[in-house]
Amino acid sequence: MMDLSSKDALSDVLKDTHAQSSDPSLWAIFGHQSSDNVHEGGNESVSVEQEIFDLSQLSERPVSETVSKASIPTNINGLSQVKPSALEKSQEVLSLQKLPIKGRRPAGRRGRPALNTSNSLERNGTRYVSAEAPISVKSSIPAIPRVTFERLCYESAIASNLPPNALSPLEAEMLSEILENPTWLSLYLSIRNGICYLWHRNPTLYVSFNEALGIVREKKAFPLASLAFEFLSRNGHINYGCIYIISSLKLDESLSQKTVAIIGAGMAGISCARQLTNLFAQYEQDFLSRGEKPPRIVIYEASERLGGHIYTHMVPLSDNEVSEKSSLATTVNATNECMVNLLTDSLIGMPTLDSDPLYIISSQQLSLDAVHTRNREFILHDIENGRIDTEHVQRIFRLFDALLFYFNASASKQPLHSLITPPEQEFIQKLDQIGWYISIEAFPLQIKDTLSEFLGNSANTLTSLLHLTVLDLKIFEWFKEYLSQSLSVSLENVYPGSIPNLNLLLGENVASYSFKHGMADMLNSLASTPSPLPILFDQCVHTVKLEDNTVNLSFVNETTVSVDKVVICIPMDKLNTHLITFEPPLEEKKLKAIDRCHFTNVKKVILIFKTQFWEPNISIFGSLPQDSGRNFIFNDCTRFYEHPTLSVFVKVEGIDFMKDDDIVNGIVSQLKKVYKPKSEAINPIRTIISNWENNSYTNHSSYQISNLFLEEDYAILSEPIDNTVFFASEAISQKNSGSIRGAFDSGILAARDVLASLIGNVVLPNTLVIEENLEQPRKTYGTKRNAQQALGKEGERENKEKRISYHTEYLRLRQKRLDKEQQECDLLIAELLGPSPVPPSRPSANPYLLYQKTQWHVCKTLADQDKQRVTGDPEARATKNEIRAKLGKTWRALDSLGKQPWVDEINARRANYSTRLEEYQRQINSYNVRVAQIKSEHQRRCESQPIPEDEAKLKLLAEQEDEHLHPEKEGMSVENSDDDYHDDLDYEDSISEVFPDNFS
């Protein structure tokens, strides 16, 4: 490490700051706060003559000067753009008139107030559907083939994290009772998917209500479109993020206005505030109909910056510290600055980038400069034997990823397709792709209580089955350590189902993204676009007191504010401490749920170098675990920071006694062991360490579900208090807990609940679908005939299309019933017989391919030696083509006796394949016989049941419709008949059956 100053100068700079290290290249983040040398502004650094930087001296506000000024609202109770003192801000902004108490309202669904509100149709002036409605059907449907449009709608529903062919759990809770009719349900899903298409077609523009109604094809479906639009808008599936919603209403300044306070300016608080801004603009008419303006939003942040755990800092570099080969030196108008993230460097698109709302906001709405990565390149070194072959490492990685998939899939609730294709069979298929085979009849893996125990037992079991070597097990242990560092938690604390997207963290083709100007750039843009959110810094709330329908907030600066709604967006562990006091206190069940949350701490060490000495274009590298000493895993951040940079995550547990410079020395020492020939270049010019545990407001780096956490704790943590105090945190999100995405989702859901408490839940209309009168078909047909006479040939063609609607609807409903019966039959087969036997994979018939697979490492060593001898470079490595050429040359050099071992192995595999194929044929024949029996019995049982009433009614109407369409059949004469001649005896027999007594 570089010595940049003398000992005396060091003591002068760190006087009374209690910095954790005296190393000039070491920055202690979040140490003891000091008021000396505080520099106002955004991501600007403190200039110190001795070139020692202590981030505890920095102002924590990373927002640019323009954004920070715009963050303070104007024209609200006389607020000024100049930063006032805390007392002045409290007196000017927070002195709100106490709103009149309106009393408690009757509770509605799930204990929420049953307010009298209108649905979307009524708000927009369409209380019923008529021919004079100003909204045009099909106006939002693009001029593309219908098959293409339906495919786009299907993909858009998936991108909105909704099942395209079924109701989501929230939709089922709201609409399952009123959408019992399969026809209505199918129509609703098609409309809902179409609205999702309108949003994902261009998420920079919000989807208006009239545009959503234009997705329907008939006016009778307008109420369903209204419901779908309400659900998608309120739950944040559409119209989220940085969108500008035009308001055409004139607000009366004399109207009253409520206030919604948000405590905390992290990702949860900013996303909640931005979503509330969008919702209040969309539902402006609802508030005006109540005689009030849309509520104002105020965000209170205890620190001097926004972001919480999202922290980006600018590192200044001198000219001689920037290498000519780095991207900083080659960028036009580039400054000698390096933006580093103190926690998360990248976000994972879960499950894909198209379905990640944060990626949609950052890439399409904000157009931030993103860096994409898809495949993780792992480079491992053996300190004694050098670098390990990449394909060897990748093979063990795919085995490790398959184990994570099986652990995650077995613990979750399986849908229909997973019952037919269970995790065991998919795991076997993944191994078969790698080149290993195990039998499903003797499946060896068993789910254990923790992930650590599962991986340990699986490694022991698979060692004998797959003939894993000692090197394979060392690589496997390295991946276990990497997963533990990625999760920031010990694998002993990860139990089945605790991390829903566990297999995506190490996925082979999972896309991730970051931002060149730091992760805070996304949050700052979200807070300032399209209009700045009103954020007040240095406002630490210590008491939340509920009185009737209002909330009194008391701050540490002895000011008090009365608001109508409060959203608590601070870390969950702070609710169980004395940082914020609740009056009345929180319920015991909520406190117990908070105790079951698990918060961990890690130190992130960032090393900036002048030149890059490690392999380019890689993601992660490290060395195999040693018998003694701590093993570090290095993340290449060069593509993020545009300068040669490595980051290392170090667990705080067990190293509390170590100083920061000791940790850095250990990391640099391991780097020098891995890259011995380049040890002289391994000298960082800057070192940054994050110490989150020393921060008063975010004294942990990550959140993780403990093994004591219960599934119902999610609902307990998010449950509001008296429909007035709401909660949002990364711990509340069930799908993405402990992540930035989870904090964003919790803010969206909290905004939904706040809106429902202000204007009420979605009001279900009395009639979902305005249908034709089905009980008087003859009158309807008569009306159609009159219309046909009035309209002529064009009306005849149009009414003819309407006449076949009953027949088409009957066929569709009948086919849906048959599909449901087939689905039930498949489930029954899966439950009784299990999955279908898997055919054995055909072995290779070429002995050279087997030789190539087994002798790759030997020929690679020979090719490397040849390359080093020719080039004279002891570090030279042969390319893949050169290794393949060496393989072919050595194979051709072998005689028939030398090739015989591989030929014998191929013959043995063929014999084994023949035996397995015969066994498979026997099993599949027996399986097919049992399947045919089950299908026959199931079909007989279904045919014995009566046809559903709706289908029977449509069948009758279809038959009547067919009679009206072909009336000539009834009056067909004998001369015009094409039927064959019938014997008179048949005619007499039919007459005798009708008149048995009187006929003779």
Swiss-Prot record:
Keywords recorded for this protein, A-Z: Chromatin regulator, Coiled coil, DNA-binding, FAD, Flavoprotein, Nucleus, Oxidoreductase, Repressor, Transcription, Transcription regulation
SWIRM domain sequence ranges: 153-249
Domain of life: Eukaryota
PANTHER family: FLAVIN MONOAMINE OXIDASE, LYSINE-SPECIFIC HISTONE DEMETHYLASE 2
Record GO biological process: facultative heterochromatin formation; heterochromatin boundary formation; mating-type locus imprinting; pericentric heterochromatin formation; regulation of replication fork arrest at rDNA repeats; replication fork arrest at mating type locus; silent mating-type cassette heterochromatin formation; subtelomeric heterochromatin formation
Protein's job: Catalytic component of the SWM histone demethylase complex that specifically demethylates H3K9me2, a specific tag for epigenetic transcriptional activation, thereby acting as a corepressor. Acts by oxidizing the substrate by FAD to generate the corresponding imine that is subsequently hydrolyzed. Has a role in regulating heterochromatin propagation and euchromatic transcription. Also has a gene activating role.
Bias type Acidic residues, positions: 976-991
Binding-site positions, FAD: 260-302, 328-329, 908-909
Name assigned to this protein: Lysine-specific histone demethylase 1
Cofactor(s) for this UniProt protein: FAD
Cell compartment(s), UniProt: Nucleus
EC number: 1.-.-.-
Coiled coil region boundaries: 107-137, 434-529
Major place of residence: nucleus
Family recorded in the similarity comment: Belongs to the flavin monoamine oxidase family.
Oligomer and partners: Component of the SWM histone demethylase complex composed of at least lsd1, lsd2, phf1 and phf2. Interacts directly with lsd2.
Molecular function in Gene Ontology: DNA binding; histone H3K9me/H3K9me2 demethylase activity; oxidoreductase activity; promoter-specific chromatin binding
Region (Demethylase activity): 279-950
One of the record's GO cellular component terms: subtelomeric heterochromatin
Region annotated Disordered, chain positions: 104-123, 780-800, 959-1000
Gene3D superfamilies in the record: FAD/NAD(P)-binding domain, High mobility group box domain, Winged helix-like DNA-binding domain superfamily/Winged helix DNA-binding domain
Pfam family, one: SWIRM
Keyword Aminoacyl-tRNA synthetase set for record: no
